[in-house]
């Protein structure tokens, strides 16, 4: 199963993006929030993915953060919530807002999403209320502890090497990016800035 893609943002549409990984273009369907977070066409990006397989279709769903993918998987466990509805919810609400709505039983907040009526919204918050505290709402905290700056830097160097940059150039560009962004910089931020420095 494809869990994550690292490459260049090749093309975008209203609810999808094409990620070029070593010359292979992967079509991923995304929420509007994830699409906005991926950056500009031609820039390096990282997409967390979930493969949905049905009798007549196979599609890759893409997320800018692992926490959004986790919430997508939780939402699609609720009866009546398919990938389209789950993406609509994650387009209308941040993961933090989804978590708050479920924890507080706030069906009205979930019903703000396109295609989600009061009955379905009520079912979502009722079924996910007990699970709301089990997932991180946004990157940071535990996620940062699990992926310290050193790990992010190493992954960023690897990503640049995969894009064709020599190891020395990739390492120098990432080190420069780290200096500019600070120790708390995420992998995607490091890749974005380092790519500009390496190409410059």
Curated annotation (Swiss-Prot):
Region: Domain I, residue numbers: 1-64
Keywords in alphabetical order: Cytoplasm, DNA damage, DNA recombination, DNA repair, DNA-binding
Domain of life the protein comes from: Bacteria
GO annotations of cellular component type: cytoplasm; Holliday junction helicase complex; Holliday junction resolvase complex
Organism annotation: Erythrobacter litoralis (strain HTCC2594)
Region named Flexible linker: 144-154
Record GO biological process: DNA recombination; DNA repair
Localization per Swiss-Prot or TrEMBL: Cytoplasm
Alphabetical list of InterPro entries matching this protein: DNA_helicase_Holl-junc_RuvA_I, Hlx-hairpin-Hlx_DNA-bd_motif, NA-bd_OB-fold, RuvA, RuvA_2-like, RuvA_C, RuvA_C_sf
Protein name: Holliday junction branch migration complex subunit RuvA
Region annotation Domain II: where it falls in the sequence: 65-143
Region (Domain III) location: 154-200
Pfam families: HHH_5 (PF14520), RuvA_C (PF07499), RuvA_N (PF01330)
Domain notes: Has three domains with a flexible linker between the domains II and III and assumes an 'L' shape. Domain III is highly mobile and contacts RuvB.
Function: The RuvA-RuvB-RuvC complex processes Holliday junction (HJ) DNA during genetic recombination and DNA repair, while the RuvA-RuvB complex plays an important role in the rescue of blocked DNA replication forks via replication fork reversal (RFR). RuvA specifically binds to HJ cruciform DNA, conferring on it an open structure. The RuvB hexamer acts as an ATP-dependent pump, pulling dsDNA into and through the RuvAB complex. HJ branch migration allows RuvC to scan DNA until it finds its consensus sequence, where it cleaves and resolves the cruciform DNA.
Organism lineage string: Bacteria, Pseudomonadati, Pseudomonadota, Alphaproteobacteria, Sphingomonadales
UniProt main location, coarse: cytoplasm
Annotated family: Belongs to the RuvA family.
Molecular function (Gene Ontology), one example: ATP binding
Signal peptide: none
Subunit structure comment from the entry: Homotetramer. Forms an RuvA(8)-RuvB(12)-Holliday junction (HJ) complex. HJ DNA is sandwiched between 2 RuvA tetramers; dsDNA enters through RuvA and exits via RuvB. An RuvB hexamer assembles on each DNA strand where it exits the tetramer. Each RuvB hexamer is contacted by two RuvA subunits (via domain III) on 2 adjacent RuvB subunits; this complex drives branch migration. In the full resolvosome a probable DNA-RuvA(4)-RuvB(12)-RuvC(2) complex forms which resolves the HJ.
Gene that this polypeptide is encoded by: ruvA
Record has Cell inner membrane as a keyword: no
């Amino acid at each position: 199963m494809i869990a994550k893609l690292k490459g260049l943002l090749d093309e975008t549409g209203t609810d999808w993006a094409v990620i070029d990984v070593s010359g292979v273009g992967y079509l991923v369907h995304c929420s509007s929030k994830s699409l906005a977070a991926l950056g500009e066409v031609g820039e390096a990006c990282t997409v967390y993915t979930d493969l949905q397989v049905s009798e007549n279709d196979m599609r890759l769903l893409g997320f800018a953060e692992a926490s959004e993918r986790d919430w997508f998987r939780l939402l699609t466990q609720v009866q009546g919530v398919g990938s389209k509805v789950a993406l609509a919810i994650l387009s209308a609400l941040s993961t933090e807002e989804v978590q708050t709505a479920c924890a507080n039983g706030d069906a009205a907040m979930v019903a703000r999403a396109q295609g989600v009526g009061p009955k379905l919204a009520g079912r979502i918050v009722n079924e996910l209320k007990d699970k709301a505290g089990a997932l991180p709402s946004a990157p940071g905290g535990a996620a940062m502890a699990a992926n310290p700056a050193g790990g992010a830097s190493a992954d960023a160097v690897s990503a640049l090497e995969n894009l064709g940059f020599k190891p020395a150039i990739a390492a120098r560009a990432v080190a420069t990016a780290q200096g500019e962004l600070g120790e708390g910089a995420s992998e995607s931020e490091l890749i974005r800035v380092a790519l500009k420095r390496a190409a410059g």
